[in-house]
């Protein structure tokens, strides 16, 4: 799998993620004869080959630069072409933890979509695990099939993923009774697919499920379906992830604030005088008199400016954060552009048959 192997340098044929800005990452297929163009200029692929991943690469015009990063599921989530709404990394991390997806886990995913979750699961379960993912939309299925083959995720190219074009709500899941350890449903009506899972849950150990739904009404329907079919430990979680940045804020004293107000007032008065002078010049019909008046007024203006500039002007130069010549205090600021919550997460557990029978006999 492309996303599970790591190397130091860019090679011809690689899939890379180009970092153009904080919120702008795009996938690039490195081909020696191609050139990538953006607002900073041209970036020939031939000059990228041999560079280290993470190295700064300047445009031919030296007007800007990009970074080439080796793709990971986390970076791919930020760079992938959106075919549907996607699952972001904060939700993916919690789903992995609650479903206990680890190396060697067998997972069913219904609703491949843009395959953000598929890439993360495939990387986690490794070569000993299996991902059975289903997509009912024909066009999205074909796009995902090509993408998975290029990323070496499919079973027929040495990967661990089975991709199937199927409407699981109507036709169920696999034709064979494959047992899985975890189930992830990203469907408009997951409660219609839940009854079809009975042939695929383990009877000798627990099987865990997550339903990913944007509306609380969908969660209610899914919870009722799970409860009726004997699933337990049903809970809903909403991930409200925030990233806080530690910064320093300059302490401004009252004297400095007063000086700044005086400076603003002085500039406003000067601007008024200049506008007044231009109006008088426009009204003058005698050019010679106009010039004389202009000279005298400029002289008066200069004298007034020299008098008022006796006040210490407030500097407009940029002050570097943490400059030792100023006083600073530590503050924190939340990143408002962070992509996290998109839906509610409904979790449940299906107990092994023997343990479930014991629980029913003993009662609550």
From Swiss-Prot:
Q: A GO molecular function for this record?
A: tRNA (adenine(58)-N1)-methyltransferase activity
- What compartments host this protein? Nucleus
Binding-site residues for S-adenosyl-L-methionine, renumbered to this chain: 114-116, 135, 140, 167-168, 186
InterPro entries hit by this protein: SAM-dependent_MTases_sf, TRM61_C, tRNA_MeTrfase_Gcd14
Q: Which UniProt keywords apply?
A: Methyltransferase, Nucleus, S-adenosyl-L-methionine, Transferase, tRNA processing
Record organism: Schizosaccharomyces pombe (strain 972 / ATCC 24843) (Fission yeast)
Q: What is this protein's function?
A: Catalytic subunit of tRNA (adenine-N(1)-)-methyltransferase, which catalyzes the formation of N(1)-methyladenine at position 58 (m1A58) in initiator methionyl-tRNA.
**Its encoding gene is what?**
cpd1
Subunit relationships? Heterotetramer; composed of two copies of TRM6 and two copies of TRM61.
Renumbered to this chain, the signal peptide range is none
Protein name, entry field: tRNA (adenine(58)-N(1))-methyltransferase catalytic subunit trm61
**SUPFAM superfamilies, from UniProt?**
S-adenosyl-L-methionine-dependent methyltransferases
User: What Gene Ontology cellular component terms go with this record?
Assistant: cytosol; nucleus; tRNA (m1A) methyltransferase complex
Family membership:
Belongs to the class I-like SAM-binding methyltransferase superfamily. TRM61 family.
Reaction(s) catalysed by this chain, per the record, are:
adenosine(58) in tRNA + S-adenosyl-L-methionine = N(1)-methyladenosine(58) in tRNA + S-adenosyl-L-homocysteine + H(+)
**Top EC class of this enzyme:** transferase
Q: What is its main location?
A: nucleus
Gene3D superfamilies, per the entry: 3.10.330.20, Vaccinia Virus protein VP39 (3.40.50.150)
Q: What is its EC number?
A: 2.1.1.220
Q: Which GO terms describe its biological process?
A: tRNA methylation
**Which Pfam families does the entry mention?**
GCD14 (PF08704)
